[in-house]
From Swiss-Prot:
The keyword Transmembrane helix does not apply. Keywords: Ribonucleoprotein, Ribosomal protein, RNA-binding, rRNA-binding. It comes from Ruegeria sp. (strain TM1040). Belongs to the bacterial ribosomal protein bL20 family. This is Large ribosomal subunit protein bL20.
Length: 121
């Protein structure tokens, strides 16, 4: 049985890792062993932060909605506004509400009035 040398496969694998480490500082960009560790850690951060991004954007939307609601009515809080939306049967998610609050304040004001009417009733 002849000897099987894995040089091309190993070279391709190393090249893939070095390519992923492009732009890194020091030995992390051109030494396979160090680059592999750096790329693995970067992938861990990327996985974690894909989860955190959802959390961060939801918090941002809530802050924007709260600020816009308070600019329309000082006494109305975010939680009471959301309660008013539920009572009024308005099913709009926070992403759309935040976008309306920033780009179309008049339309958002109409939604705030509907929520207030539902709370008063």
């Amino acid at each position: 049985m002849s000897r099987v040398k894995g040089g091309t496969v190993t070279h391709a694998r190393h090249k893939k890792v070095i390519k992923a480490a492009k732009g890194y500082y020091g030995r992390r960009k051109n030494t396979f062993k160090v680059a592999r560790q750096a790329v693995d850690k970067a992938n861990q951060y990327a996985t974690r932060d894909r989860k955190n991004r959802k959390r961060n954007f939801r918090a941002l939307w809530i802050q924007r909605i709260n600020a816009a609601v308070r600019s329309h009515d000082e006494a109305l809080t975010y939680s009471r506004f959301i309660n008013g939306l539920n009572l009024a049967g308005i099913e709009v998610d926070r992403k759309v509400l935040a976008d309306l609050a920033v780009h179309e304040p008049e339309a958002f004001g109409a939604i705030v009035r509907q929520a207030q009417d539902a709370l008063a009733a």
